[in-house]
Amino acid sequence: MKNTVTRLVCLVAVALATVGVRAEKFSAGGISFEEPKSWQTQKPSSSMRKAQFAIKGKDGKSAEVVFFHFGPGEAGGVAANVKRWLGQFKEPADQLNAKTVIETINGTKVTYVTAVGTFMKGPPFGGNKIPVPNSGLIGAIIEGKQGAVFIKATGPKTIVKNAEKDMKTMVAKALKK
């Protein structure tokens, strides 16, 4: 009995030790991604979401990262989505210190968007929205062969800013395969 308990404890210890080092892989729009180690997988809260993650801050707060893919020609294009994302803030777009940067990675166009302000958290179409001051947004729109993949992180501006490098590295790795 003692040997069985010892083996079980060792097995659990090894399993717990490896949880933090394994990277989860997932795909959206025919593009395979590897989850950054600082992100925690969550069950998507909507059938529209292809993947969903949390990024925990040291203060217990967290940011949310979501992936969407609707198929070729769907979801209104890059400019419409950038406008929609910036419109999710209380302030007008010209007061968000918003930046849009376009890159081409291995022949695929990627539009990155950043903004800081009061994010209006809530359902995308209607419903009650809750103002969340000092929020940040980092988004990536990948114009893939099977249609655009939309990645959006929102939450406390410090957490979102710190996640920018991980998001860009994840996108670059996915497109260089």
Regions found by a protein language model. Name each.
Residues E24-Q42:
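Short N-terminal segments immediately surrounding and downstream of signal-peptide cleavage
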Residues W39, K145-K177:
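Surface-exposed amphipathic alpha-helical segments
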Residues V19-A23:
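Sec/Tat signal peptide C-region and signal peptidase I cleavage site
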Residues V9-A17:
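Bacterial N-terminal signal peptides
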Residues K58, F70-P72, V116-M120, Q146, ...:
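Solvent-exposed coil/turn segments that connect beta secondary-structure elements
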Residues K37, T41, S45-K50, V82-I142:
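Signature of long, low-cysteine stretches enriched in small and polar/charged residues
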Residues M1-C10:
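Bacterial N-terminal signal peptides that target proteins for export
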Residues Q52-R84:
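A short acidic-to-branched-hydrophobic micro-motif
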